[in-house]
Amino acid sequence: MTQPLVTTTRKGVIPTYPVLLGIVFAICTVGMTLNLVAAIATDVVDEGPRTLQEQLAGVIGFGLGSLAIAALGAWWCSRTGARSRLGAVLFGALCVPTLILFFSGAPGMFGATAAFLAGLTRGRTPSAGVPRVFGIVGLSVAILNVLVTILGVSIAWLGGGSPSAG
């Protein structure tokens, strides 16, 4: 027997899940994609192990894949309270090893999903205990992913080049 999740009219600075996920995707994945396209168009030379075109393919592929996994995972896990708690832990843990895919936005999207499933986004009832801890970790990673992407791209372009995405 499943019980519907109780939602609240929680207000605060943390937006609803679709808005939070959209912000992370737009800034990290779309923003980095546009950054790499601009770098390719302006013939910026990247001395990293991968070409700008390879980095672009990675950002798009991992970004879209992460978006699909995060959205489907949130949909499936949010159907019951037990799944939400388990999903918060799973996505909160998953956002840490995906830090290697930082500029694709993967850790931020998984972190936003952990925060949603832990009830930390607007319109949800917060969980207690371990799911809440993983939700806080996920929310922190999501915020940092956005801020560091903005800062990294800005500093790199002001310094005369494009940041390496991979």
Residue ranges and their predicted role:
Residues 145-166:
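Juxtamembrane boundary at the C-terminal end of a transmembrane helix
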Residues 89-115:
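C-terminal halves and exits of single transmembrane alpha-helices
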Residues 59-75, 91-95:
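Generic alpha-helical transmembrane segments
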Residues 99-104, 120-133, 142-152:
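Juxtamembrane membrane-interface segments at transmembrane alpha-helix termini
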Residues 9-17, 68-88, 114-137:
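Cytoplasmic membrane-interface segments at the C-terminal ends of transmembrane helices
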